[in-house]
Amino acid sequence: MDKIIRFELNSRMCNFFRKYKIDYRINPNVKIPKEILKYLKRGIVKRKDKFAKGCWTYKYNRQFALTYSIDDAIGNEASNSEIFISAQNDDLSVSRTIKIALTYVYALSELMKQYRNEFSIILSYEYIRCGTEPSYGFDIRFHQIRGNDSYLVKNLEVYNKHNGILVLNILNTSKSEIQTINSPHIST
């Protein structure tokens, strides 16, 4: 049973993953723009990934691997990427998976302070079924936004988890308000 957390973030954040040795897989079939590739080329390991057919991987440990792919759905500019964290250890509990994932989120939120007025964040918890085994995870999407509506993450915390609903606080520093995002109900 895999537990998957998906990040969508601006290419300039790729340096963060290399600096802190967080792994990622790179799909060789995806055309990576030069401005993004320069952040990644020193971390690419040309080795087949046994967990994801057709992907190359840079391994960090036995429990986690990250998948990197380019999202160019908006216009012709591939300014965002998707990074998938997949827990390969079946013994990892849902709560522990979330705890580990939030560690990355806290670190990313600290990094985001360097890019004031450039990113927003959307989080949700999701129930995933792969074959006959249920999988748990939550989406963490960092969106690059422009103009006066942009804001950065100052504080991020889980303040309630009840009946499979994960609720997170996001402090919008531009508008000085809390945004609360409720996940769909998780039924096992």
Which residues make up each language-model segment?
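N-terminal leader/targeting segments
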Residues: 1-86
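A structural detector for beta-sheet-dominated domains
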Residues: 10, 33, 86, 124, ...
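A generic structural signal for short, solvent-exposed coil/turn residues
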Residues: 77, 115, 132-134
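Intrinsically disordered, low-complexity boundary segments flanking structured domains
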Residues: 109-110, 127-129
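A short glycine-rich, hydrophobically flanked beta-strand micro-motif that places a catalytic Asp/Glu
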Residues: 120-128
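Polybasic, proline/glycine-rich intrinsically disordered low-complexity segments
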Residues: 129-188
